[in-house]
Amino acid sequence: VLSMGACGTDSDKKASTQQGTQETASEVFDGPHSAQMKLDLSKLVTKLADYKGIDVTISGNYDVTDDQVEQNLMSLLSYYGITGVEVKDRDTVQKNDYVKVDYTGYLDGDAFDGGSATDTMIDVANNCDATQKTNYIDGFSDGLVGAKVGEEVSSDVTFPENYQSSDLAGKKTTFKFKIKGIYKPVTMDTLTDDMVADAFTEQKITTKKDLVAYVRQVLEKQAANSKSQASISAVEDDLLDKCKVTIPDEYLDARLQEYQHEFEADNCNDTQTLEQYAKNNNTTVDDMKKQWKELMIKQIKIEFIFGRIAEKENITISDDDFKSFVDYLVSSGNSQMADENAVYKYYGGGNKEDGKKTLRQLYVVNQAISYVVEKANITVEPDTQTTESSEN
């Protein structure tokens, strides 16, 4: 729920040369460490509102429908290459067919680079790739209707004047197709257990029924996570509005310095300063710092409020639970948190003990948030916009 990086987005994994720069930066951070500052939350949280059984409202659609399952299942089938069922009672292509072809494009009689493919499934009616749903040049599939399996047919195509390749822009070309099979779009009725078993071997899904159950389980998990996050945000906002918190200036300054250090380690290197990063993202360092401060104040208030609740409710953390939490961070794929010590250094600005203390505090805060959410009276209002858009 909370993290030291709450003021910004996670960066992509860096190249190995950048990792070295980042690790060095973490080691040399010598600013005041917020983890070393003594905080008396009973004095800093000057007003702690009632937090048991609070009433909050969230909006959204968290029930998974059969239509959603079918739509997502069809997208999954397309991703795994299951796009059509072969038609065997006729051999002539019709407008609404999918057609498997090999094709080659010719410019002035010579095959051109990037103009050929094998075993491509074409959606004739929509003039697009049946699997990727990417559109072809106008007229590309016009010559396929009426062709027979085993035949070779041609289509004359003129590329647009603004086509990305200057060699082809505005040029007249010819595409030759070999018709290899006729297919109908796969549907829930035509999907078979054998098709599922062949495509989902690694997942050990062998039947259509199992695939439907798998997709529903994934969607229900996503919906539950979305509902949980919405509930957490609503509870946090409610208590932020009702509680009063004082943040010591030196503590806020330390947190902002720590965050900037972490941000620069993630996003800056020998070839990109913070100023250059800001310029590349159409902003300024001053504007970035203003945003960081605004978000950090909210972050700290949440930590103080729920930290105080944890004190009042005697919420603590066991060593086993904390180890599981750290192991989860290690497995997250962040190159800067490859092992337990690296995690502590990452959250402690190079200081393992500070990082360990900070993480334990954050974990307890998260437990307190869960405690309040579990006791809250949460009303769900359907998101009418989402419902209407899904029906259209």
Please give the residue ranges for each predicted region.
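C-terminal motif of bacterial Sec signal peptides marking the signal peptidase cleavage site
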Residues: 2-6
